[in-house]
Curated annotation (Swiss-Prot):
The gene is thrS. Binds 1 zinc ion per subunit. This is Threonine--tRNA ligase. It comes from the Bacteria. Pfam families: HGTP_anticodon, tRNA-synt_2b, tRNA_SAD.
């Protein structure tokens, strides 16, 4: 079965076998010019087809178990697939095995999956009385609607799908959640069931192991256990509270970045949190991003709370006249921004409404784009290396709708390619995926569980300099428009720390650990020595805690281990008298003794091991 053809890939689109029949291509589908065959296996394109069909298998089973069920959408997503639906019946996660069993029943029936195409009028009539399907159709333009059938079940869908349910043998329903209709909290709440599917038993087994590991590493769970951050309903959804340990972790990263940025010629700047709406109209945010912004009125003047830092940095640039000798100008800011995210998509620190970007904007001449991007790529590599992340780059090129002439776009895109080539970075190309105002490079990191995360971006902008009439005096004493490069490597501190927490499972490396050393005095008479040692370490910029509660030694050691503290020092008579310390080293997975002076030299050295 693994060699069976299930679809083809052509013009960045998957065409399943049923769609090929509708298009009259079924006889020559393999011979179509420019097609890539998709076989039944665990490749990304095949999994997209498999998981889409498994979503329909889920809906078919739900309809059989709960006849009043109505269905909204059931897409393939990064973590598998889901289906949003509603029913008068109460459904909990305890019902998932029953639903899964029904899915296996239908799969074993080897039902053919067929497709027909209806007009809008026919589709509205076919799904008469189904307000959820009518809601789906209202968001689709055109007059052609695909309907897929398997057995007595049918669903409005554009595909792609497998030719038969017999392919669906290795799947698992993973969780149940609530989801607002269309992600809008003003709409009714639907039930959402998530699932995963693979072509092979091994693929499913490996994934389920990864899921269990991911649950242990969930940053929301670790945030509570390690006292890093919290959320409070009285404050509001998507607005994190940084607790002392989390703030220490974050500040350490900020400080390391700041040191590196200053050495790399960046200047710190700071813009206001709210700006008049007039300036957002000039930038285009008011017309194109308004629904994601928060607004307030002061003295009858409308202000917008900034969703991005770029306008403030533009105003810094405009605060003085510039010549070519001043360029490049590199401004950075840990800028707090606010974006109106729908409550249904909020997720711990990964998706919040207030966050801080490691933002920078570079104003340079066109000829300086390559060298500036090259420097950013070098900076990115050092940061990713320090945090033990592998990463990949994706270059997005000119979309169909864009500003600027072909020559300008070609030069900008070529500059990005040459910078990537200079650093011998393999990269993917997203043809037409750039912003309308310039090409970009996306930075995607891979964590310890082999999950990919979108973090940083390097974006060439030829739009905002034009909108704000930015200029510098060139060598010929003429006014010339600079290029603006938007640059964020981490993306946001919130998102990066969430990913970092899950990458290390809370076992942060020594140089950023929120508590780096735990001092455990065995008895009260050892407490004074512990406090003195704490002060010595604090002067070396080490985060230290003294665990001096009236608990047993074993309990205090377990507490330090549970808090994932890299080094634990147990202080008793011998340590106090000889100043030879007993060290439990998490990173080395060893216990050893070391004279105090040598230990201090070691921790100082560990703090200096990492620089960006």
């Amino acid at each position: 079965m693994s060699a069976e053809l299930i679809a083809v890939y052509k013009d960045e689109q998957i065409i399943d076998l049923e769609s090929a029949k509708v298009l009259g291509l079924s006889d020559g589908i393999k011979a179509l010019n420019g097609t890539e065959p998709i076989y039944f296996d665990d490749s990304p394109l095949a999994l997209e087809v498999i998981r889409h069909s498994c979503a329909h298998l889920l809906a078919q089973s739900l309809k059989a178990l709960y006849p009043d069920a109505k269905f909204f959408v059931g897409p393939v997503v990064e973590e598998g697939f889901y289906y949003d639906f509603k029913t008068a019946s109460k459904i909990s996660e305890e019902d998932l095995p029953k639903i899964e069993a029904k899915m296996k029943e239908f799969a074993k029936l080897k039902l053919a999956i067929t497709k027909e195409t209806l007009t809008r009028e026919q589709a509205l009539e076919r799904f008469k009385g189904d307000e959820l399907k009518h809601a789906v159709m209202s968001k689709i333009s055109g007059d052609a609607f695909g309907v897929y059938q398997q057995g007595e079940f049918e669903d409005l869908c554009k595909g792609p799908h497998l030719p038969n349910t017999r392919f669906l043998n290795h799947f698992k329903l993973t969780k149940l959640a609530g989801a607002y209709l269309g992600g809008d909290e003003n709409n009714e709440m639907l039930i959402r069931i998530y699932g995963i599917a693979f072509a092979t038993k091994e693929g499913l087994k490996d994934y389920l192991f990864q899921i269990e590991e991911a649950k242990k590493r969930d940053h929301r769970k670790l945030g509570v256990e390690l006292g890093l951050f919290s959320f409070d309903d009285e404050i509001g959804a998507g607005l994190p509270l940084w607790l002392p340990k989390g703030a220490r972790l974050r500040k350490r990263i900020e400080d390391l970045l700041s040191q590196a940025l200053l050495l790399r010629g960046y200047e710190p700047v700071k813009g206001p949190e709210i700006l008049k709406s007039d300036v957002w109209k000039i930038s285009g945010h008011y017309d194109n991003y308004k629904e994601n912004m928060y607004f307030t009125t002061i003295d009858e003047q409308e202000y917008g709370i900034k969703p991005m830092n770029c306008v403030g940095h533009i105003k810094v640039y405009q605060s003085a006249l510039h010549s070519y000798r001043d360029l490049p100008l590199r401004f950075y800011e840990y800028g707090v921004v606010h974006r109106h995210e729908k409550s249904g998509v909020l997720h711990g620190l990964l998706r919040v409404r207030e966050f801080t970007q490691d933002d920078a904007h570079i104003f340079c001449s066109f000829e300086q784009i390559q060298s500036e991007v090259s420097a950013i790529l070098d900076f990115t590599h050092k940061i990713m290396q320090a945090f033990d992340f592998s990463y990949e780059m994706e270059l997005s090129t000119r979309p169909a709708k864009s500003i600027g002439d072909d020559e300008v776009w070609e030069k900008a895109t070529s500059a990005l390619k040459e910078a990537l080539k200079e650093h011998r970075i393999d990269y993917k190309i997203d043809e037409g995926g750039g912003a309308f105002y310039g090409p970009k490079i996306d930075i995607k990191i891979t964590d310890a569980l082999k999950r990919k995360w979108q973090c940083g971006t390097i974006q060439v902008d030829m739009n905002l300099p034009e909108r704000f009439k930015l200029a510098f005096t060139n060598e010929r004493n003429h006014a010339e428009q600079p290029v603006m490069i938007h640059r964020a490597i981490l993306g946001s501190f919130e998102r990066f720390i969430a990913i970092l927490s899950e990458h290390f499972g809370g076992n942060f490396p020594f140089f950023v650990a929120p508590t780096q050393i735990a001092l455990i005095p065995i008895n009260e008479e050892h407490h004074v020595f512990a406090l003195k040692l704490k002060e010595v370490l604090k002067k070396r910029d080490i985060f230290v805690e003294v665990l001096d509660k009236n608990d047993s030694l074993n309990k205090k050691v377990r507490l330090a281990e549970k808090q994932k503290i890299p080094m634990i020092l147990v202080l008793g008579n011998e340590e106090v008298e000889t100043e030879i310390l007993s060290i439990r080293d998490r990173e080395k997975q060893a216990q050893y003794k070391m004279p105090l002076k040598e230990f201090l030299n070691m921790v100082e050295s560990k703090m200096q091991e990492v620089s960006f």
